[in-house]
Structure formats: C-alpha cells, structure tokens
C-alpha cells in the first residue's frame, strides 16, 4: 500500500515527527493501516513497539518523501508485529532484562572486589588438618591456602 504526503502529514510535518505524537500501540497500527490481532498486541505490545523502533533506527529517512517514509514505517511495524505474532517475546528478547537472563548465553563472570585495606591487613593463616586455611576479614569465610604454609 502506498500513501501520499497528505495522508500522513497534512500539516507538513514528516512521518517520524507525526508518529512521535502517537502514544498507544493501537494508534500506531491504525495510523499506519496495519491490521492486528488484539490478543497478540495485548500480549506483546511493548516488545512490538520496541522492535519497530529498532527497525526504524536502521532505516535512513532523510530526504524521503513523506509517502515513501510512511510506507517504510508501515513495513517496520508489520515486520515487528510478525516477529511476535509467530513466537514469544522470550525468543526475541528485545529488552535488556530478558537479554541478561537468556539461558542460551553463558553467564557473565562474577567479579569480586577486594578493598585495598583487606590486602594490607595481616592474614590469619593456620594449619587445619594438614591444609593451610585463611580467614577472609570481610566475609568471615575460611578459604584454602595450600601454598601459605610452605
């Protein structure tokens, strides 16, 4: 479907500026003429809109006639909707909180912070059943220190 400039920006504003004034996901679908299943939209609205934004950022809208820009915006919304109409938001993981909890990715290594004061304190090394141990002052944990008694 093709749109003329007057369809989207009767006051002369470009399509992206016009879209920024919309707030509800349904408004985007209605404005761009994209049909949708309310059940899919209710389940994945934020994911669809975020993905549409990702697709729009990848497009170059500079110097495009409004009708052409509107057609591209419509295609971005249709593509984003299709992504979530056929699979769950967990599959696409568009939000950082879901991306960080992706079970298919290796967990980030845990970084342990040891304050300088901890390093400068004298250590408490003792022989515990033939194994040298050291007590951590900060966490009060006992850790093996096999080379400490040599």
UniProtKB/Swiss-Prot annotation:
GO biological process: nitrogen fixation
Coiled-coil residue spans: none
Keyword tags: Nitrogen fixation, Plasmid
A matching Pfam family: NifW
Annotated InterPro entries: NifW
NCBIfam families, per the entry: PRK00810.1
Entry's family note: Belongs to the NifW family.
Annotated function: May protect the nitrogenase Fe-Mo protein from oxidative damage.
Subunit description: Homotrimer; associates with NifD.
Record protein name field: Nitrogenase-stabilizing/protective protein NifW
Gene: nifW
């Amino acid at each position: 479907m093709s749109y003329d400039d007057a369809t989207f920006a009767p006051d002369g504003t470009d399509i992206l500026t016009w879209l920024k004034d919309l707030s509800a996901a349904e408004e985007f679908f209605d404005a761009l003429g994209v049909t949708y299943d309310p059940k899919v939209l209710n389940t994945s609205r934020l994911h669809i809109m975020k993905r549409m934004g990702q697709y729009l950022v990848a497009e170059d809208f500079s110097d495009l006639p409004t009708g052409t820009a509107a057609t591209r915006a419509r295609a971005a919304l249709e593509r984003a909707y299709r992504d979530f109409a056929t699979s769950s938001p967990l599959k696409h993981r568009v939000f950082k909180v879901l991306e960080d909890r992706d079970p298919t990715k290796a967990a980030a290594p845990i970084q342990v912070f040891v304050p300088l004061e901890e390093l400068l304190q004298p250590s408490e090394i003792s022989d515990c059943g033939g194994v040298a141990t050291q007590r951590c002052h900060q966490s009060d944990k006992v850790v093996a220190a096999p080379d400490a008694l040599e």
